């Protein structure tokens, strides 16, 4: 994994990144299974993006995995339209805070 990595998408195979804000070498999209092979995460990593849930994992698992790996940046969780977004956000943030992560949620 690039030492200049700034943005990492996990479990979003069709992720695209805004250029020129993020250069191609500063972004990557991987599966959760591939994450272990990319440890330790580079200090340049500013943002991790992951889905609320998918076939392989859910947001709570990502929070635990990143926290255990020592990541202390921003985790942005992508969600479908939710009936009560605030309840989900509150629950995820309570877990993220215990792991030292800042959490954002976006539809």
Where does each model-flagged region fall?
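Conserved beta-strand segments of the P-loop GTPase G domain that flank and frequently precede/overlap
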Residues: 9-11, 48-52, 75-79
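A short helix->loop->beta-strand "cap" motif at the edges of active sites that frequently abuts
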Residues: 69-75
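Conserved phosphotransfer microenvironments
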Residues: 47-67, 85
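Short, aromatic/basic amphipathic alpha-helical patches
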Residues: 18-24, 62-65, 86-97
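A short linear-motif detector with a strong N-terminal bias
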Residues: 7, 27-28, 55-57, 82-85
């Amino acid at each position: 994994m690039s030492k200049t990595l700034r943005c990492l998408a996990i479990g979003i195979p069709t992720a695209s990144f805004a250029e020129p804000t993020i250069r191609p070498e500063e972004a990557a999209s991987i599966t959760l299974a591939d994450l272990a092979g990319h440890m330790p995460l580079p200090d340049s990593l500013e943002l991790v993006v992951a889905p609320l849930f998918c076939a392989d994992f859910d947001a709570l698992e990502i929070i635990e995995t990143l926290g255990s790996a020592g990541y202390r940046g921003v985790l942005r969780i992508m969600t479908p339209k939710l009936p009560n977004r605030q309840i989900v956000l509150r629950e995820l943030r309570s877990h993220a805070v215990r792991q030292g992560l800042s959490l954002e949620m976006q539809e």
